[in-house]
Structures are given as structure tokens and as C-alpha cells.
Amino acid sequence: MANIDDIEKQIENIKINSDDNKNNVSKNKNILLNGVNLKDHEIKDNVKSVDYNNNNNENDTMNEINKHVKNDEYCNKENSNNNNNNNNNNNNNLDTQINETLNLNEKFEKKNEENLCSGCKKVLIKKLSCPICLKNKIFSYFCNQECFKGSWKEHQKIHENMNKENNEKEDHLKTIVKKHLSPENFDPTNRKYWVYDDHLKNFVNFKFTGDVRPWPLSKINHVPSHIERPDYAISSIPESELIYKRKSDIYVNNEEEIQRIREACILGRKTLDYAHTLVSPGVTTDEIDRKVHEFIIKNNAYPSTLNYYKFPKSCCTSVNEIVCHGIPDYRPLKSGDIINIDISVFYKGVHSDLNETYFVGDINDVPKEGKELVETCYFSLMEAIKKCKPGMFYKNIGTLIDAYVSKKNFSVVRSYSGHGVGKLFHSNPTVPHFKKNKAVGIMKPGHVFTIEPMINQGHYSDVLWPDQWTSATSDGKLSAQFEHTLLITNNGVEILTKRTQDSPPLGFDTKDELYYN
């Protein structure tokens, strides 16, 4: 119960001030009457507290009125417009005085109500307030603890009604929010309701660099219990990777491990080709993710991205200015978009990793520079792969890619690199894609790793979204990416995730005869 200071003196002051105000209004009204043309206006008295029954005052007032009526007749002939303006001003002043008095009376009555005990209805000397009512800004006071306890059953009804009203308001709000956040009604340009969504609330004040916006997410995909899982599937933390990071060596896979990785890569290629067939205007990236997930599960594998450091989906979908790691959501694809789909599969205890960038809809809707960007990215990867062999320094890959891309006036992203893959999703070596990098290591037979250059139309810098995954170009311009998983052999390199004759075309001549001998 909260103690409140004694306000009896304040109430007395309010009463005195109220009486004074009533008398002042009465006097002011008599004075104002002298300036009103009674032939044109009717005076209505709305103030209950003003007394006009005093005969002496009536006679004096009428004498004054008669004098001014004669003056008013003369004034009307000389200047009727000025007199009408004065009358309006006088009436407005009168209304103001009346309203002030009525408001003062209302305040006085409210103060009286606040000084009555909600239990016994006695006048309070000291006020004790119900803590629940006080929290909800409801005026409810009691004499003492005993009165409060004795009135609790009856007083509790106030809380019940209050809770009912709050629940109704909350349900109504949920209905409105659900409607505005539904895929069919969602407006990505209106952030008003984003605060009510666990995913979108992080973006309320975020400054986007391009046109792509986050959309609501669907629920996390379910994985059947019989599917073999990596160590992070439940905890989201890849403990085996953290242990391996303490080492600096590059793992050399044996023949049995290479065979399992090869099978995982074949499944990864089939999955990516299937995802490519789903790309079409109007299709959402969430739908692509859901079908990719079902395809992988159907083949008794686990989608490697799912719950990896809490990544919420089974593949990555990066549209237009999104560099990499875009989270599939309810955003529908549009003709003229470019989309990168990144597939990773955990199968028979090992991972595979690959991605490609596709044109959405009519290729003529894609900007010319966008087409050139995608082609440049693809061939920069393939040219670097051609040079891979035992004895080559990993840092030279970045030199080759950067040289090829620079000739086309594009730039290479520096924030992300290729990596070792196999028993671990990410391991040594680190494979940067830009020149003058400091990567360590020399290629040896049995090394399995990825090369996955991200090429930007504008500046190479990127911005991380508040979801802690999505990376976008800093200038909002387009970005493209391609990735393969590679095996260093005794004689050169094998592309484990290579395209097949059944792979859907990329929309340009990939010159497979040069790269798939």
C-alpha cells in the first residue's frame, strides 16, 4: 500500500478559489452585459452559481442597460460593423469565463472522489492506494490495511474487469499485427508492425543500402530423428570446429573419406540443380528453402546450414545486393532479379558445399551490367580452379581471381573466404579471393576445400544486417557468387561439385569443354 500526503488544506483552498471564481464570473457577466446590444442578442445564463435574484442589483443593472441601449442605437447607425465585432468578442469572453468555472467545479468534484475510501466511503485523512490500481493509473484509495482486506473481494472485480479489457485489447492488436505481417498483406516499406515480429524488430531503425528488405520468416524446418546430424544440430555450436581451429595444419583426407565427400558433393549438385528449377517470378525464397529441405531429407541427408550458429534455414538465398548468407523468407522473386542459392549437405558424416547465381524470369529484364557481373564471377572461379595443383600456394588463388575481375571493372569482396570442408563444415585452409592476401599453406593431394568468390558491381565493402547473417553491398549495387568444392589430386584438381549434362543452363555459355576435361 502506498502512502499519500494529506490534502485537506488543498481541498479547502480549492473550495475558496472556486467561490471566488463564481463571484468574479457573476461580476464579469454583469459588466459584459452592458456592452451587448440586447435588440440583437439573447443572454443565456449557464452558470448555476451566479445569483440574479437580488432586486437591488437587478434595478441597477436594468438602469445601466437602458442607458447603453440608447447609446447602442446611436452607435448602430454610425458603425454597425464595429458594434457587431464587439458583441462577438464579449460573448466569447463570457463563454470562456463560464467554461473555466465549470471546469473548476469538475476538478473539485474529482478531488472529493479521490478523498473517499473505496471500501467504507469515509473521507480519508491519509490515502493508501492499491498497488495494482496504482500501477495501472486507476484512482482507488483506502483508509487502512484492514479496510483494504475487507473490501478485497469486491475490489478484485475492478482488477478482473481491467484484465479482461487488457486481454481484449491485446487480442485485437494481435489480430491486426498478424494481418499486416502475413505474406499476402506484408508491406516491406512500412516498418510500423515490425516491432511485433521477433525477426523484423531488429531492423526497425536499420539503414538499408539497397532495395531488398527482410520479410517475415516461416517456422524452422523439422528434421526426422533417423537423419544423421552434425554436432551443432541441437546446440548450434560446432564444437569439433572450435577444437580444430587450435591447429594450423590442413587435413589430408584418406581414400575412404574422399569417397564419402564425393558422394555428398554429388547429392549437393543434385540439390542445387533442383533448387534452380524452382526459381521463377512470384516464388518466395521460403518456398525454395522448404522444397530444398524436403529434397535433402528425402535423400537421408542433413542440410548443413540449419542451426549452424543458429542460422534458421536449410539453404542461403541472396538476392540482388545481398552478397551472401541471405535468409530465405516470404519475399517473392521478381523478373530481373539475380539470386544466389547456396547449398550445403551433410551426408555419411561429411559436408559438401556449392552455390550458383541465377537470373530470375526474363533475362532481358536483368540489367546488362548485372549479366556481365554474373558471367565475370563464374569465369573468375573457373580460371582459378584451372591453376590448382599440388605445390600451389593458397594465397595465389586470390591473385588470379582479383586480376580477372579487375579487368572487368568489378571488385572482389574481402570479408569472406573459401575454406576447408569435409568432416567439418568449415576448416583450414582459409582461401581469400583478393590479391595481396596473407593466406598460409600449400596445396597437397587429399586437400578438400572450396573457392567461392563474391564479386560486387561497385565497391568491394559490405554491410552486415542486424540478423547477424545477411551481408549486403555497402553501396546497394549488385553482387554475384559461385562456389565449388575441390579435391587436390596427384596430378591436379577434381571439381567434386561440377555441373552435369542435366544441370539447367545458367543463361550464358559456360564453356564447359574448357573446364570439365
UniProtKB/Swiss-Prot annotation:
Belongs to the peptidase M24A family. Methionine aminopeptidase type 1 subfamily. A zinc finger (C6H2-type) spans 114-166. Keywords: Aminopeptidase, Cytoplasm, Hydrolase, Metal-binding, Protease, Zinc, Zinc-finger. It comes from Plasmodium falciparum (isolate 3D7). The lineage of its organism: Eukaryota, Sar, Alveolata, Apicomplexa, Aconoidasida. Pfam families: Peptidase_M24 (PF00557), zf-C6H2 (PF15801). Zn(2+) 3 binds at D342, D353, E483. This is Methionine aminopeptidase 1b. Cotranslationally removes the N-terminal methionine from nascent proteins. The N-terminal methionine is often cleaved when the second residue in the primary sequence is small and uncharged (Met-Ala-, Cys, Gly, Pro, Ser, Thr, or Val). May play an important role in parasite growth during the blood asexual stage. Residues 79-94 have a biased composition (Low complexity). The keyword Metal-binding applies. Inhibited by pyrimidine derivative XC11. Zn(2+) 4 binds at D353, H419, E452, E483. A protein binds at H325, H426. GO terms for cellular component: cytosol; cytosolic ribosome. Highest activity with zinc and cobalt ions, and low activity with manganese or divalent iron ions. Binds 2 divalent metal cations per subunit. Has a high-affinity and a low affinity metal-binding site. The true nature of the physiological cofactor is under debate. The enzyme is active with zinc, cobalt, manganese or divalent iron ions. Has high activity with zinc; zinc cofactor is transferred into the active site region by the ZNG1 zinc chaperone. Optimum pH is 7.5. Zn(2+) 1 binds at C117, C120, C143, C147.
